[in-house]
Amino acid sequence: MNESGSIGIIETKYAEFKELPLKNGSVLSPVVIAYETYGTLSPSKNNAILICHALSGDAHAAGYHSESDKKPGWWDDYIGPGKSFDTNQYFIICSNVIGGCKGSSGPLSIHPKTGTPYGSRFPFVSIQDMVKAQKLLVEFLGIDKLFCVAGGSMGGMQALEWSIAYPDSLLNCIVMASTAEHSAMQIAFNEVGRQAILSDPNWNNGLYNENSPRKGLALARMVGHITYLSDDKMREKFGRNPPRGNILTTDFAVGSYLIYQGESFVDRFDANSYIYVTKALDHYSLGKGKELTAALSTATCRFLIVSYSSDWLYPPAQSREIVKSLEAADKRVFYLELQSGEGHDSFLLKNPKQIEILKGFLENQSSP
């Protein structure tokens, strides 16, 4: 554990609720939400910030769980004393989405009627349902209005949904490397990943136990990971070496890297959750043009929209569509396209310019 600039040891907590009515009409009962908090809630409870994670993320956004942890939470560079989300100033909340597999209710949860994991019997969940569960947690913590909701990628979709579903419950909204809806290409990549899982001999219609569809999930992660990088970054990192020319093994370094990413992913993620969460992403849509403007018209908060020049999964054009609709709806919005060669994952990586932008947006309440 490297404590330099870190908030130190953090404990994941759990909140349980009786039920959660879902968008599709079904009811999830009971509902467990795994979450972590960093910093101190002010007496007036006006300094709370909700951080929303991406597809494979979790509630562990900062700090360490134990002295033996080698890596901190997934956004530790941005959350902590003096950082963008300054824990000396703000009370930070991060929860695992429902449908996920990191402590919140999802396919790995025990079905109350069968005593076995839900598996594919878990109800379909949407981005709206994820946000609805987060609202339960925020209220449970005694917070009426959030100072900010922030997230990248899928987390950005959740932040957008917060702005229109609960317009009176947040003052600021930060959307990074995200979109208001998936394009056909974005859906296609997710579908290939899902089909890899469904074709695994251990799939068993989603009712697997210890013999899970690891190979299929690894392939799904390999496909997804390609979209997180940029062509320039892959060329710089791997090039074309070393070409081994063996038909039975991976020929190039990039292949070995993707295999490693896939194999390591299956030890920390569930195949059913991958299907549920990617479907939630694909189904979410606020529309385009006038439809998007109308959807965002109920928002009352300030917006910061950030895109990245080399992000080809959620390219800057999709962020600009959001900005255009916010401006058409006469909303307060600041937009920045950061020059980065790291691809979609840029929002996760330490970037002095990004640190400055996030910190400045939160501190300067008079702009834009």
Swiss-Prot record:
EC top class named in words: transferase
GO-annotated cellular components: cytoplasm
UniProt keyword annotation of Acyltransferase present: yes
Pathway: Amino-acid biosynthesis; L-methionine biosynthesis via de novo pathway; O-acetyl-L-homoserine from L-homoserine: step 1/1
Matches recorded under InterPro entries: AB_hydrolase_1, AB_hydrolase_fold, HAT_MetX-like
Principal subcellular localisation of the protein: cytoplasm
Keywords, sorted A to Z: Acyltransferase, Amino-acid biosynthesis, Cytoplasm, Methionine biosynthesis, Transferase
Pfam families: Abhydrolase_1
Any one GO molecular function term: homoserine O-acetyltransferase activity
Catalytic reaction annotation: L-homoserine + acetyl-CoA = O-acetyl-L-homoserine + CoA
Domain AB hydrolase-1: from-to ranges: 47-349
EC number(s) recorded for this UniProt protein: 2.3.1.31
Location in the cell: Cytoplasm
Binding residue positions for substrate: R221, D345
Segment forming the signal sequence: none
Active site: S153 (nucleophile), D311, H344
Gene3D superfamilies listed in its UniProt record: 1.10.1740.110, alpha/beta hydrolase
BP GO terms, sorted: homoserine metabolic process; methionine biosynthetic process
Family: Belongs to the AB hydrolase superfamily. MetX family.
Function recorded in the entry: Transfers an acetyl group from acetyl-CoA to L-homoserine, forming acetyl-L-homoserine.
Binding partners and assembly: Homodimer.
Name of this chain's protein: Homoserine O-acetyltransferase
Organism of derivation: Leptospira borgpetersenii serovar Hardjo-bovis (strain L550)
Organism placement in taxonomy: Bacteria, Pseudomonadati, Spirochaetota, Spirochaetia, Leptospirales
Gene transcribed to yield this protein: metXA
